[in-house]
């Protein structure tokens, strides 16, 4: 459930239209009233909302919790303003205590350190991290590069782009919140549905490398740099066969090859002898979605030989399930 604090000033645009109902005093309770943008948005101490507005926000937000028992409450930006801090704490206490009464696991998503680490999920809008964090984080993004909603002429991502982002995010202890934009009649555009179906096909085969896994000692290896920060996930990432991402579960390490090589030869530095990251013995390697258990040798690197043309992955990543003992 998406909740907003920036509506204190966000209806400013409507203030420019004389006949808009945002200017009608009769609707002041609905719109805030709309304050207009007169502040420096980067200054968390600048011109805070009124006490009346923040009290009203808290009551409304708690009312939503009681009415709908949301599993996740997602706060968009501007919530990091210093004046909101006492109200954020009050809301978190109320929501988490109510969740305990319901016997339900819940979470708060927030940006820009609005909540202290460990009390909410840190969210990056259309962005990723370049490292592992011990606290769960989230990348919220969309199937289109240019829009959050249905727009004629949307610049859609490729299904493989979304899958690759998912793998990278999970390897760094993150979660992916993926948006699609329905048409006005509620139907899902075919372009959106195609991306979801292709993701589903990949996850049906390789989901065990994602669901219920944890991050490994390092998130991965390879030459391709994933930029960190908000609004960075639309940059083209040209992954190579040297780009690997790791997850783990039980006695398995999942090494996802982000671009499968034509010759079928894989070399993983982190699982070789030189880096000394893996102390266990490798018992078996399986390529998910196949019956193949390729030959391997653990030298300076972990060298895996699958043979040319054996795997036809296209632009989708391939998962190696590595069993250790």
Where are the model-predicted features located?
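Mature catalytic domains of secreted/periplasmic carbohydrate-active enzymes
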Residues: 1-325
């Amino acid at each position: 459930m998406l909740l907003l604090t920036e509506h204190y000033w966000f209806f400013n645009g409507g203030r420019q239209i004389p006949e808009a109902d945002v200017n009608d005093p009769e609707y002041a309770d609905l719109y805030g009233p709309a304050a207009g943008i007169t502040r420096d948005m980067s200054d968390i101490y600048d011109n805070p909302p009124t006490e009346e507005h923040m009290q009203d926000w808290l009551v409304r937000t708690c009312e939503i919790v009681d009415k709908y028992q949301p599993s996740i409450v997602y706060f968009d930006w501007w919530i990091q303003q210093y004046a909101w801090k006492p109200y954020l704490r009050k809301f978190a206490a109320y929501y988490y205590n109510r969740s305990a009464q319901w016997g339900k696991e819940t979470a708060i998503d927030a940006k820009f350190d609005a909540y202290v680490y460990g009390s909410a999920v840190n969210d990056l809008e259309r962005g990723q991290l370049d490292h592992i964090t011990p606290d769960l984080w989230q990348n919220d993004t969309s199937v289109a590069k240019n829009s959050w909603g249905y727009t004629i002429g949307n610049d859609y991502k490729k299904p493989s782009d979304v899958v690759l982002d998912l793998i990278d995010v999970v390897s760094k202890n993150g979660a992916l919140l993926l948006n699609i934009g329905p048409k006005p009649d509620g139907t899902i555009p075919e372009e959106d549905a195609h991306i979801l179906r292709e993701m589903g096909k990949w996850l049906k085969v390789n989901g065990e490398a994602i669901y219920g896994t944890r991050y490994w000692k390092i998130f991965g290896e390879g030459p391709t740099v994933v930029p960190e920060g908000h609004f960075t996930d639309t940059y083209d990432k040209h992954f190579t066969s040297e780009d690997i991402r790791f997850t783990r579960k039980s006695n398995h390490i999942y090494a996802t090859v982000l671009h499968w090589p034509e010759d079928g030869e894989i070399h993983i530095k982190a699982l070789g002898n030189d880096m000394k990251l893996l102390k266990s013995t490798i018992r078996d390697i399986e390529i998910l979605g196949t019956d193949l258990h390729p030959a391997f040798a653990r030298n300076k690197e972990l060298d895996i030989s699958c043979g040319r043309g054996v795997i036809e992955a296209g632009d989708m990543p391939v998962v190696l399930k590595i069993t250790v003992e």
